[in-house]
Amino acid sequence: MSIYEESLIFHEKYKGKLEIKSRVKVENSQDLSLAYTPGVAEPCRAIHKDPSAAYMYTRKWNTVAVISDGTAVLGLGDIGPLASLPVMEGKSVLFKEFADVDAFPIVLDTKDVDEIVETVVRIAPTLGGINLEDISAPRCFEIEKKLKERLNIPVFHDDQHGTAIIVLSGLINALKIVNKNIEDLKIVVNGAGSAGTAITKLLLSYGAKNIVVCDRDGALNRDIEYSNKYFEELANITNPNNESGILKDVIKNADVFIGVSAPNIVSKEMVKSMNSDAILFAMANPTPEIFPDDAKEAGAKVIGTGRSDFPNQINNVLAFPGIFRGALDVRATEINEEMKIAAAHAIANSVSDEELNPNYIIPKAFNLDVQKKVAEAVKEAAIKSGVATI
């Protein structure tokens, strides 16, 4: 039986991976009068007088919505909101299991950016944070930007930033192994969608100087006029030498390859053209840009993928639960670059110097100490950067 057949049976058995449970008992009239009428009027009055009291008298402080329109689901593409629901339920389960965050799925039957934004803004009073999920680019950039402008709670598109944080954490540790500094590297990012864009921007924030971003047509550079304004932006902040050509051209003399693109597009010959002790994060799923054994045979030093059956899995579950735990605990108004970098360091530091080796640069997903470390680091960064409100 395949994992897909087994999962179908699993989902049929449980008929949903989430349920709502009461935190209080209602066993007599006194309980009823406290939990509901007439007693409930008093916290209502308190919140009406001071809206921040909602964090004291309701579950707002620990509640996150996992919101999707179903337009970019896993490797399935645009399958619509209803078909995306199992993924959003699963994401909500991970929030609860890994960081005790109460998350619930909301799938929206619209692809219109402004309709999505308006809908989320209208339900935001219930929420302490918003996790955007599986929304196609470039709409995901617009939706996140507009929501951040209108809301004072964390808004986080995990497909962008969760991936970027794990990539940075892996790169921090990989650089210890090859004894290189990020500012000296040539980094090639293949894939200019949501993940590739966020990875590029976070690495630049961390100190990278020479990143070349490729899409299916080749390197983004300043000699090309792009109809996509996000490509234009990337071209203006990357590729300092204004290189042109397709992937096999620009990967020459690169120190790092980061793939969020398509299967089997990196050959052994391309790896051989990279600098010595090359680092490759080939994250296309289920088939990576190059398989680890092939990359190693071609001379690569450190290889990561998106798969759990190879070493060094780039897995967002190491990031998003702890990030939201930390942000919620200090009532952060946003998740900023300082918090993302702090999370990346916390994840990287969860691998000790004694454990660190080319096949172990990223901790295992079920090491729950990682989430605690991430949460603490994010809280501290939120306080230092001025976005914590308690």
Task: Label the predicted regions.
Residues M1-V155, A381, S385-T389:
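N-terminal ligand-binding/catalytic initiation module
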Residues L74, P81-A99, H157, H161, ...:
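Glycine-rich phosphate/diphosphate-binding loop of Rossmann-like nucleotide-binding domains
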Residues P105, N131-D134, V155-D158, V189, ...:
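General beta-strand structural signal in soluble alpha/beta enzymes
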Residues R150-A164, L280-N285:
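Short, acidic/small-residue loops that bind anionic groups at enzyme active sites
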Residues E232-K301, S308-D309:
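Rossmann-like adenosine-cofactor binding region
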